[in-house]
Amino acid sequence: MPASQTGKVAIVTGGTANLGRLFAEALSADGANVMVHYNSARRADEAGETVKALEAAGVQAASYQGDLTDRAHITGLVDSTVERFGSWDILVNTTGVIVRKPLAETTEQEFDNSFSVNAKIPFFLMAEAFTKMADNGRVINMVTTQVAVTAATYSCYAGSKSPVEHFTKAFAKEIGPRGVTVNCIAPGPQKTSFLYGAETDDTLKWLAGQTISGELGEPADVVPVMRFLAAPETSWVTAQTVYVNGGMISPIN
């Protein structure tokens, strides 16, 4: 059974769609109050619907819109959360952007944006957590299976997610004395708009064939891992990357 998060406060970035929405729903179902972040004003309606769905679980919920590549919005998100709920215990960072191009064809703008979204955001969210997260908190960063083995045309995506593993390990040691754990989840390819927007049908079939089951993952497959890492009882699991990819790759094969 999922551990009770009653009275805890969670921030879920990218919390209106795909994994972010599922994570927010799972945390609220476990009793946590949730601040749902979303990037674009175009998602305001989705954010409102998400907040209503979370409140239906009997918890408090709110939303914050902002481009987190701007450090001021990171601070604003955290400060708004603490002001609204009184504390901050859990961070689940799902922000990400895919550039699927050969390295030599990737533009400087695409490179800069990839590193701003995939690496800068989690780095400075963790910086905020150092002084503003409650003791015994939980930090969970979403990376990708490709931090272990990178496929062709994914140099920018995998390269901009890889630093997050190192940030996570270092930050786990820096904040660990306060009982805060810091971990990564590295999903494989899943049936989401995030993947479908970057891949052809042939590539999707090939990716599915790399898993043991021959199927792409579902976002729901990752939720139990997030719940485990966010649980109050999971205090001795930190500085780790958990691969959730249907057996398609591990960091040692």
Residues covered by each model-derived region:
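Substrate-binding pocket helix/loop in short-chain dehydrogenase/reductase
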Residues: 102-103, 110-115, 195, 207
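Conserved glycine-rich cofactor-binding loop
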Residues: 9, 16-17
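Catalytic loop of short-chain dehydrogenase/reductase
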Residues: 140-163, 168-177, 189-190
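Conserved glycine-rich Rossmann-like NAD(P)H-binding loop of the short-chain dehydrogenase/reductase
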Residues: 32-47
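Short C-terminal tail/terminal secondary-structure segment
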Residues: 149, 227, 238-253
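Alpha-helical segment proximal to the catalytic Tyr-Lys
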Residues: 131, 173-177, 235
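A conserved structural motif in NAD(P)-dependent oxidoreductases
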Residues: 211-222
